[in-house]
Amino acid sequence: METYILSLDQGTTSSRAILFNKEGKIVHSAQKEFTQYFPHPGWVEHNANEIWGSVLAVIASVISESGISASQIAGIGITNQRETTVVWDKDTGSPVYNAIVWQSRQTSGICEELREKGYNDKFREKTGLLIDPYFSGTKVKWILDNVEGAREKAEKGELLFGTIDTWLIWKMSGGKAHVTDYSNASRTLMFNIYDLKWDDELLDILGVPKSMLPEVKPSSHVYAETVDYHFFGKNIPIAGAAGDQQSALFGQACFEEGMGKNTYGTGCFMLMNTGEKAIKSEHGLLTTIAWGIDGKVNYALEGSIFVAGSAIQWLRDGLRMFQDSSLSESYAEKVDSTDGVYVVPAFVGLGTPYWDSDVRGSVFGLTRGTTKEHFIRATLESLAYQTKDVLDAMEADSNISLKTLRVDGGAVKNNFLMQFQGDLLNVPVERPEINETTALGAAYLAGIAVGFWKDRSEIANQWNLDKRFEPELEEEKRNELYKGWQKAVKAAMAFK
């Protein structure tokens, strides 16, 4: 009887279940969206029970539609939207408040206060992160400070905290396992990435009782088994977990030091594996844990680009330049260049390496000769320029030159963008056959833990190339184009 690994990809707008076979190929998948709540401007929340319901629904869909039985699932891997925070009652299992999503800015006042008290360097030294509403620590503090009775219950040991992986493992195991993995713990602003434990001093500053926190385990590990009443009468090992970007790095088989991947989604997330050493960034990058496996922890440098695919959506929905995003490629290829036009898509500020939340989107170099095609091409090129900003910061911090860039996400179907990316970086860009690398990474982590796959070398052999984009641009032209981008960013930042 053939067996499979079930990967649960719990994202910001939907939950997906994907069944993988021994060759790392997709057998079946299901997806279900859930509600986004915006109680105030800048706030983003989810209903944690609704997320759980969506996960159960996609698992049921995959099992019933694929025709396999639950006994054929060798293990379950989880990958999740990172930083999103759930606090729930240990006895009843009910969340005390909505899940506060990674995008939500509702803790900006808390962050401002912590920065004013001079804590930024302390958090950075221990966690590799900045004090920012993005991360979980201030979200937990906000819930304890703002939900009636929450702090008292937390101090009595009655409340639990978890990122989405922790919440799902707790629910799937019937409340038996309160755990997280190293990659998710490293995004909380409460975990010391050098000592590999929750940091008492940081917990004290944030006012978060240690009793709320999950046990931190390797990313490839049998955490618990599912309770049978949710899983068709079977106890299935829950055996792997990683935050979505780290999971994509694993799914792209970036196992060696200096290997990197860029995910082109709503924004871009670029990660470079730095091996067993954590590199402290001097250039606006985050230092994070890639995964913990085989008794060792791998670290990564991470750069965040806030606007990527959403810039293409803006051309489609806001400016109505085309009806389907896939048409952006053919429009861009109708012209030889942007004719000097630069689009800086800073709709919500700029991320790595600038970290400027006040700058706004700008367009430079317009003339009477500028056409729709020039504008579309310039917007697509902005994704590649921002990626170069991040890669330059990574190479400066690590003294490692990237040999190839592996790519995934929705925008990688755009051949024009991928070729321009390779040209600009002067590095080959590799697009894999399977674009679902985030879900695949979680499947691999679970599969290794249950012996479905032997080790990372077996997985590396499964990585198959769809297309390699070799750089073709002359150095002089590349430098000239990038200098124009740098001028445009500088001008955009000056205009506030």
Curated annotation (Swiss-Prot):
Q: Which UniProt keywords apply?
A: ATP-binding, Glycerol metabolism, Kinase, Nucleotide-binding, Phosphoprotein, Transferase
Residues at which ADP binds: T12, R16, T266, G309, G410, N414
| Residues involved in sn-glycerol 3-phosphate binding | T12, R82, E83, Y134, D244
Q: How is the protein modified post-translationally, according to the record?
A: The phosphoenolpyruvate-dependent sugar phosphotransferase system (PTS), including enzyme I, and histidine-containing protein (HPr) are required for the phosphorylation, which leads to the activation of the enzyme.
| Top-level taxon of origin | Bacteria
Which residues bind ATP per the record? T12, T13, S14, T266, G309, Q313, G410
PROSITE patterns to which the protein is assigned, alphabetical: FGGY_KINASES_1, FGGY_KINASES_2
Pathway assignment: Polyol metabolism; glycerol degradation via glycerol kinase pathway; sn-glycerol 3-phosphate from glycerol: step 1/1
Q: Which GO terms describe its molecular function?
A: ATP binding; glycerol kinase activity
Phosphohistidine modification, residue list: H230
Q: What reaction does this enzyme carry out catalytically?
A: glycerol + ATP = sn-glycerol 3-phosphate + ADP + H(+)
Q: Report one GO cellular component.
A: cytosol
Q: Quaternary arrangement and interactors, per the entry? A: Homotetramer and homodimer (in equilibrium).
Question: Which NCBIfam families does the record match to this protein?
Answer: glycerol_kin, PRK00047.1
Q: What does this protein do?
A: Key enzyme in the regulation of glycerol uptake and metabolism. Catalyzes the phosphorylation of glycerol to yield sn-glycerol 3-phosphate.
Q: What is this protein called?
A: Glycerol kinase
Annotated organism of origin: Bacillus subtilis (strain 168)
